[in-house]
Amino acid sequence: MEKHAFDPACCLGERLQTLSRAELTALAETICRILTERGTYHGGIRPDNISRAEDGTVGLGAPARTDTKDWTTEELEFMAPEVFWSGSLDASADVYSLGLLLYAGVMGGRLPFYPDDRAPQPEDMAAALRRRM
């Protein structure tokens, strides 16, 4: 298996919100190290595209698809605006997505502009996504 390859059996997904701040920090550091080692931009940093084994081993899934507009909701939720609007993939897109990942981890899975007083409904999530884009 390729070093830092994504392992679907260890998909981070909703487990993101169970990580401690120390674990979130270690996860972010590892993701940055992986991207630096690869020497490329990813554009697809999101919970369902990260694997984290019990021993802390981290893997990244496929990079962002910039040649399509047929994205999943999860892809859109963590996508940088410049990737959405122009397909522009650079370090700032990865910083943006990593920042959202950390925000969601600290905030119990909530993303910016979700309502504070209740669980977000689909229309709340769509409105929040529009504000972030």
Q: What are these model-predicted stretches?
A:
Residues L35-R52:
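Catalytic-loop of the protein kinase fold
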Residues D94:
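Conserved catalytic-loop aspartate of Hanks-type protein kinases
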